[in-house]
């Protein structure tokens, strides 16, 4: 017999702890207006370099395609950074990139002032051109500004930006700490089908609702959520490192069971976009948060289906059958 159940789990996740957690970015613009970004948060498949390049382009006021190279985590050239951990990259490194881009825009305005003969507060850098906000002066291409500066100095236009989240540790009056500047939130709902004869659990539907702030790149956010849910499904149903006397009993993927594409259901996503004032263009983060509520929601769905609580992961067919049998015998 197969029974279905629905489970729900909600989580919060802290972003960018204050203290020793700075981020730095360095840009240089060549004579054609194209920009190289130097950052230290490695992109290991999550798409952070793409998202950060989008932030940079917006902050400078140039097309995204003008960010032609991203040098990430090169110990010879990149600034120091804490790394791609703790779902911090969009918030911490993103703010550093935004600040660096704004500094480069300030430099471009100062150089455009010399060409356009108007004050910098009357100049806007938009879509790769310096515009007079009154429209009385012909726009100047950023590439022309950059070429003029390189011809004059022999150096590209450079800018540096840094950001460090603020944390309050042990306030002297209240004794309270504010370690994290912001948090992300998520709720996930899952429907499962449990075979009471074999103990097998099959996920039939998943809904994931996440507050990640403003989405810089919605497609990358959805990829992160799908990846986190896939990891959570493995944690909940199949993945387990078996140890005996300090030795791993299942050291290969032939006996350490990862979920495949056949195990991942269609995932309905609901984005709750809030505007985080301290984040880069309102963004917060997404990454690990997608993993957090997945296994609890699955275990709650198993309970809803067959009335048994699985209290250790993974919820293998053997554990589910044992729990069903124990309930029947009670």
Model region roles, listed by residue range:
Residues 1-4, 33-36:
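Immediate post-signal peptide segment of exported/extracytoplasmic ligand-binding proteins
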Residues 34-39, 203-205:
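Short, aliphatic-rich beta-strand segments
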Residues 9-31, 39, 46, 182:
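Conserved beta-alpha junction segments in alpha/beta enzyme cores
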Residues 41-42, 98:
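Conserved short loop/turn motifs at secondary-structure junctions
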Residues 31-32, 127:
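Residue-level signal for tight coil/turn positions that link beta-strands
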Residues 49-50:
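Conserved strand-to-helix beginnings and helix N-cap segments that scaffold or border functional pockets
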Residues 2-9, 15, 54-330:
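C-terminal catalytic domains of large/alpha subunits in multi-subunit enzymes
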């Amino acid at each position: 017999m197969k029974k279905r159940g629905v489970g729900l789990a909600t989580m919060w996740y802290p972003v960018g702890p204050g203290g020793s957690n700075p981020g730095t970015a360095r840009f240089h613009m060549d004579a054609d207006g194209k920009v190289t970004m130097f950052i230290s948060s490695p992109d290991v498949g999550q798409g952070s370099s793409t998202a950060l390049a989008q932030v940079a382009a917006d902050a400078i006021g140039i097309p995204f395609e003008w960010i032609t190279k991203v040098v990430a985590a090169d110990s010879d050239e990149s600034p120091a950074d804490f790394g791609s951990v703790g779902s911090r990259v969009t918030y911490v490194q993103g703010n550093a990139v935004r600040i660096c881009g704004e500094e480069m825009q300030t430099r471009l305005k100062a150089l455009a002032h010399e060409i356009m003969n108007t004050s910098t507060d009357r100049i806007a850098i938009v879509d790769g051109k310096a515009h007079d906000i009154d429209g009385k002066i012909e726009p100047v291409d950023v590439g022309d500004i950059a070429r003029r500066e390189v011809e004059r100095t022999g150096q590209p236009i450079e800018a540096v930006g840094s950001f460090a989240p603020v944390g309050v540790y042990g306030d002297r009056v209240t004794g309270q700490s504010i370690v994290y500047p912001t948090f992300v939130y998520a709720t996930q709902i899952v429907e499962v089908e449990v075979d009471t004869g074999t103990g097998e659990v099959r996920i039939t539907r998943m809904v994931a609702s996440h507050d990640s702030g403003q989405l810089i790149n919605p497609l990358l956010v959805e990829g992160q959520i799908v990846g986190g849910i896939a990891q959570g499904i493995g944690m909940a149903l199949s993945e387990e490192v078996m140890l005996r006397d300090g030795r791993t009993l299942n050291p290969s993927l032939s006996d350490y069971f990862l979920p495949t594409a056949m195990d991942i259901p269609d995932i309905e996503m609901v984005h709750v976009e809030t505007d985080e004032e301290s984040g880069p263009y309102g963004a917060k983060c997404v990454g690990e948060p997608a993993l957090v509520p997945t296994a609890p929601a699955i275990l709650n769905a198993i309970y809803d289906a067959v009335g048994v609580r699985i209290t250790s992961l993974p919820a293998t067919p053997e554990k589910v059958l044992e729990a069903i049998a124990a309930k029947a015998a009670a």
